[in-house]
Each structure stands twice: as C-alpha cells, then as structure tokens.
Regions:
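S-adenosyl-L-methionine-dependent methyltransferase catalytic core, i.e., the SAM/SAH-binding region
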Residues: 1-310
Length: 310
C-alpha cells in the first residue's frame, strides 16, 4: 500500500461492503485507489467500476490497479452521475457502492492545485481540471453577497461578512491571484482573538470556496437521490464524509429512503409513491479507531454511514 496515502476507514468499508467474489462494485471517488485495490483483490469473476472527476487520479490509480486486469474499469466522471455512468456501461444493478467525499490527500499535497492555505499557489481548487469555474473566478468575480453566503453556508464561518467585504475591497485594487494572497486578505478581516485560535484562520473560508468551485454539496445530494436505485437487494452503500454539511445530506438521504410512505395514516390508499428502499446498517456513524487516528490524523473527522438496499 502507498505509504503516502492511507485510505480512511479501510477495514470498516471492506467489512461493511460484504464483498462477493463475483459481485459488481463501484468506487465513486477513486482517488489514489486504496479502497479500490482492496475491493478488487477480493474479486475473482466480479467487476470494480472506479470513478473520479480528477484525471490525475485516474492515471495514478490506473497504474496501481493494473494487476487486476479487466476486473477493473476506470471512468473519468463525477460521482454525482454514478447511476448514469452505470447505465452507459450497460450495468443494471451493483452489489455495493463506496463514496469517500471531499478533497483527497493528494489534491491537498499537490501545491500547484491551490487547495492548501499553507503553501503559495495559483487560486484554482478544481477537482476536475477540465471544468471551467476555478477559485480565482469565485474570489475575483462573485458578488459580495454570494461570497458572504458561501462563507456562512459552506464554511460555517462566523466572520463571513467581514471576510467577504475584505475580499471585495482587495480585488478592487488588483485581482487576488494566489492562495497566500487570499490568506493575507482573510487574516486582515479577522479580529485578533480569532487569529489566536488553534484553527488556521483561513480554513473555513478555503473550505467554502472549494465546495463552491466543485459544487460538492449538490453532488452529494444528487448521488444520494439516484445512486442507491442501482443497488441490488442486499447491496450496500458506504459513504464517508468529513464535515457536518456532507454528513447531514447523507444521513437525510438514507432516512428519506428508510421511511417509505409519507401519507397520513387515515389515507385509504398511498398517493405519495414513496416506498422504503434502504435500511441503516448502523444507527450511528462509524468513526475511526484510536489506532487509525495515530497512523492517519487526517481521518479524525471522518464518519462512515452504511445502508443496505431492501
């Protein structure tokens, strides 16, 4: 296994996928291929479909997964389109799906991608380098009201108005071109008490901009609305999230499919059309253990939710 990349909650994911040697499985967020490698290694006549919006990830994971031959198919695409991708491949149903949400460790570590507030780089933050919208566009072109909204909603940043105002004033002088230029602007907007906090002052703002650039929350909603329909009865859905916004969407998506009919009890016939299609395997999210946290501090905020198709 690549020492530079440790798959989060690997044992828990593999255990909960209930992998059959002849099954069909989807890794909707391929990344470096760590989860996929373990899934593919348990297949004999089965198939793994690996999806990622990042072409760099497809290339790297492709090399890692090459020994598995035609047991693995890799697709450049967005996990939000998992159901459509499976349709395009002629696959009617699968036995398990795994989604590891958010930015990947390699994306954070590759300075030139512009995800990190610790190193200077062009403002980019695109998970898919072929997409049009970048962090530069958001920071330099979006109106102050939208900047404030995403800081509040996606970053849960209490100083959102001050930061949005500072960005607009700074870009009026000249465009904000790099990550550390943006960090300086954010710092200038925050009170001294906030700058003394343990958390980096730019963390929430960078999260908000990254989520906006990649439309991450809408992607999770769309995936939860459509992907579970491609599971066979007994198939498992495993979703790893890293912050409360993602986890809330996943939790709500599972709950909606668990409850089935929403018609009033006194209604003679169902008119809502909802039927129960999932059941939670664990009521509470599965968290990393002490041993994993010691080996991989980046796993500290990870939560795994598992549901089964019924």
């Amino acid at each position: 296994m690549d020492a530079g990349h440790i798959p989060v909650l690997l044992h828990e994911c593999i255990e909960n996928l209930n992998i059959r040697p002849d099954g069909i499985y989807v890794d909707g967020t391929l990344g470096m291929g760590g989860h996929s490698e373990q899934i593919a290694g348990r297949l004999t006549t089965g198939t793994l479909i690996g999806i990622d919006r990042d072409e760099t990830a497809i290339v790297r994971a492709g090399a890692r997964l090459a020994p598995f031959g035609d047991r693995v198919q890799l697709v450049h695409g967005n996990f939000r389109d998992t159901a459509a991708i499976l349709d395009r491949l002629g696959i009617g149903a699968v036995d398990g799906m795994l989604f590891d949400l958010g930015v990947s460790s390699p994306q954070l570590d590759e300075t030139q991608r512009g995800f990190s507030y610790m190193h200077d780089a062009p403002l980019d933050m695109r998970m898919d380098a072929t997409s049009g919208l970048s962090a530069w566009n958001v920071v330099n072109e979006w109106p102050e009201s939208e900047l404030k909204r995403i800081m509040y909603e996606y970053g849960e940043e209490r100083y959102a108005p001050r930061i949005a105002g500072a960005i607009v004033r700074a870009r009026a002088q000249q465009p904000i071109a790099t990550t550390l230029e943006l960090v300086d602007v954010i710092r200038s907007a925050m009170p001294g008490a906030a700058l003394r906090e343990k958390q980096h002052p730019a963390k929430r703002s960078f999260q908000a901009i990254r989520i906006a650039v990649n439309d991450e929350l809408a992607a999770v909603r769309e995936m939860m609305d459509t992907a579970p329909d491609k599971l066979r009865v007994g198939g498992r859905l495993c979703v790893i999230s890293f912050h409360s916004l993602e986890d809330r969407i996943v939790k709500t998506g599972i709950a909606r499919r668990e409850h089935g009919c929403t018609c009033p009890r006194e209604a003679p016939v169902c008119t809502c059309g909802f039927v129960q299609t999932l059941r939670s395997v664990s009521r509470k999210p599965i968290l990393p253990g002490k041993e994993e946290l010691e080996c991989n501090p980046r796993a500290r905020s990870a939560k795994l939710r598992v549901a089964e198709r019924i």
